[in-house]
C-alpha cells in the first residue's frame, strides 16, 4: 500500500507544472484581449506606446526579460503580474 501511495505522489509531482509562467497581452491595439504565455526567463509584461508618428498612436505589448528604456516620443510600462499590460 505504501508503494502505491508513493507512486501516486511521484506521478502527481512529475505531471504538475511546478514553475510559474507569466501571461501577458500581445496585440498591437489600444484595447487588447489576446493572451500569450511568456517563455522561461521572461518575467515582465511590457506595453510600449508610440506617440505622434505618421500612423497615429501605436501600441506594442508582450513579454520581456528586462524592461527596455524608452526612446524619444515613446512611453514604456513594465509590470510583473499576469495580463498587467492592459
Swiss-Prot record:
Cross-referenced SUPFAM superfamilies: Snake toxin-like
Major localization class: secreted
Transmembrane segments: none
InterPro entries: Snake_3FTx, Snake_toxin-like_sf, Snake_toxin_con_site, Toxin_cobra-type
Signal peptide limits: 1-21
Keyword Mitochondrion: no
Tissue expression notes: Expressed by the venom gland.
Subcellular location: Secreted
Family: Belongs to the three-finger toxin family. Ancestral subfamily. Orphan group II sub-subfamily.
Protein name stated in the entry: Three-finger toxin W-V
